[in-house]
Every structure is written in structure tokens, then in C-alpha cells.
Regions:
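Non-heme Fe(II)-dependent double-stranded beta-helix
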Residues: 2-152
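Short hydrophobic-aromatic micro-motifs
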Residues: 66-67, 163, 214-216
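Conserved metal-binding segment of the jelly-roll/cupin
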Residues: 208-223
Length: 297
């Protein structure tokens, strides 16, 4: 069991994953380093061949997009290994957000975010990481919408966007994402409020591998499936939510894409996620106890 004192000690986390940095410092490289990796610095190059016009057409029609082979494999492999180390240590995968590299993944996606949200981008304090293990009946989150309010104005002005990044292969066998495309739901008599409202033939599976980036309007109905015990590997993934900062804040505090939170701020934010998402994710009493202790100061 991890103590509150350990949780508050950045060196404890650096020791668990010495190849990753916290606020520019890692256990394997104690000197302060530049927190911007090559992936973040070369963000524009990641989308050099992306057809943003076709991407927009699909997004505004169906409510989501899926791009393959965008993010650098080396960065994703290090994050996947770090989450596997957290799991092996009996710690939740969401603790990966203590490390700089988890934030750098999304910083590298600025050109994509700018295309949909404009230049004024804010990170919402809503994020999670999954390790869907087929050995214990693991599953993604049940059907839901990330935000129940207005996610866009008309068909050309987006208010908020969710991004989802697989660190491993995400397949129908190990729990890939599923969506109800808006192009189908808009013909329903009323918006879907429960899974039974969905016409099964309208459901779309979205298998994806490391390097892919998936995004959807926050009012898109979506879920992660349950893994088969015959799946060969777990589904490991990250998500983070964003908004156009020109609109009223959809969360508090709004975060800066270019300046990740400090270690103490990250710890508080992560503890808040466990409280926020306890209705979506099974959590043990020990995890909730140290989260509540951190939130109380």
C-alpha cells in the first residue's frame, strides 16, 4: 500500500519510472532538462501529410475522427512501459499524469487542436488512463457522453473536444472504443439517453494502434468494450479533454497546454479525477483514502 507521504514525494515516482521526467528531472538524469521533447518541438511535422479538409468533413458529419500513425512510437512505448510498471506496483494507471511525458503527448497535438478549437486552447481538468486487462474481465468505461451540455455551435464552431490516445493495440478483443456516429443519431426520434436506445447496426468499432489519435465532440455517445479473456494483451490508453478558451470555462481550473502543472498540482488533479470518476471506474478503498487525504491537504 502506498502512503500519503510517498504519494507526495516526487522522487518516489521518479524511482518507479527512472526513464521518465517529473518537472524536467528524472532519476536517471537528475539535472534539470528541457521538458519539451522532440515530439513536442516537431509538432507541426506530425501532421505534414494530414488532409485537414477531409478530417473536418468527417468530424462535422459523424462527430469523431481517427488518425493513424501520428505520434512517435518511442515516446508511446516509454509511457506504456511506465503504466505497466505502475500496475506491477499495485498503483493506478492514472498516476502516469505525474510524468512530463504524458502531458507532452497532448502538447505535440497542438496543430490538430488548433484546427478544431482555434488558437485559444485550454486543457480541461478531465483526464484518465486505462489498463484494460483481459485476465480479470477488464473493460473500458460504459456508454456515456463526456459533456451533457453544448459541445459546438452550429456545424463549424467547436466548444470542446476529447482526445484519446492508445499506447497499445486497441482491438475488439481487448476493449477498443465504440461510437454512435452523429450522422446516425441525428435521425433518431430523440437523443440517446441509455444503451437500449441505440440501434446496434449503427454502432461503429474503432480499433487503433500505438501512434493513432482519436477525437470526438464531447456530446458523442461512446464507450469502451469489455476485453475477452482470450485477448493476447491489455488495452492501454490515455485521454484528455480540451476547450476553446474563448468560451466560458467548462471546468476548474483550466490548464495551459504549453505549461503543464507542477508536481503538487498534478497530484491534486489526479486525486480529483478519482473522486470525479468513481462512478465510472471500480476503485479500491485504499486508493480513495489516499486521494481524499491529498485533497484535504
Amino acid at each position: 500500500m502506498m502512503t500519503v507521504e510517498q504519494a507526495k514525494n516526487a522522487d518516489f515516482w521518479r524511482g518507479l519510472n527512472p526513464g521518465l521526467q517529473i518537472c524536467g528531472v528524472s532519476a536517471s538524469s537528475p539535472q534539470l532538462a528541457d521538458a519539451n521533447t522532440d515530439a513536442a518541438n516537431a509538432a507541426t511535422d506530425l501532421f505534414a501529410t494530414t488532409d485537414f479538409s477531409a478530417l473536418s468533413d468527417r468530424f462535422w458529419d459523424e462527430g469523431y475522427f481517427l488518425l493513424h500513425d501520428i505520434l512517435p512510437a518511442e515516446l508511446l512505448a516509454r509511457l506504456r512501459a511506465a503504466i505497466e510498471q505502475l500496475i506491477a506496483s499495485g498503483l493506478p494507471p492514472a498516476m502516469i499524469y505525474l510524468y512530463d511525458e504524458a502531458w507532452q503527448v497532448f502538447s505535440a497535438l497542438r496543430p490538430l487542436l488548433t484546427h478544431f478549437l482555434g488558437e485559444k486552447i485550454a486543457l480541461l481538468p478531465h483526464f484518465w488512463a486505462w489498463h484494460v486487462d483481459p485476465r480479470d474481465g477488464g473493460r473500458g468505461w460504459p456508454p456515456h457522453r463526456d459533456y451533457q451540455g453544448e459541445s459546438a455551435i452550429g456545424d463549424d464552431m467547436l466548444i470542446s473536444l476529447s482526445l484519446w490516445v492508445p499506447l497499445s493495440d486497441a482491438t475488439p478483443e481487448n476493449g477498443c472504443m465504440y461510437v454512435l456516429p452523429r450522422s446516425f443519431e441525428r435521425w433518431y426520434d430523440s437523443p440517446v439517453t441509455k444503451p437500449q436506445d441505440v440501434v446496434l447496426q449503427d454502432v461503429r468499432a474503432l480499433p487503433a494502434g500505438p501512434g493513432a489519435v482519436m477525437g470526438w465532440r464531447q456530446d458523442v455517445y461512446h464507450w469502451g468494450s469489455r476485453a475477452s479473456r482470450h485477448a493476447s494483451s491489455p488495452r492501454i490508453s490515455l485521454s484528455l479533454e480540451f476547450q476553446n478558451a474563448a468560451f466560458d470555462p467548462l471546468g476548474d481550473p483550466l490548464l495551459d497546454l504549453e505549461t503543464p502543472p507542477s508536481f503538487d498540482e498534478r497530484l491534486l488533479l489526479i486525486a480529483g479525477q478519482f473522486e470525479k470518476y468513481r462512478h465510472m471506474q471500480n476503485m479500491d478503498d485504499e486508493t480513495l483514502a489516499w486521494c481524499q487525504a491529498i485533497l484535504k491537504g
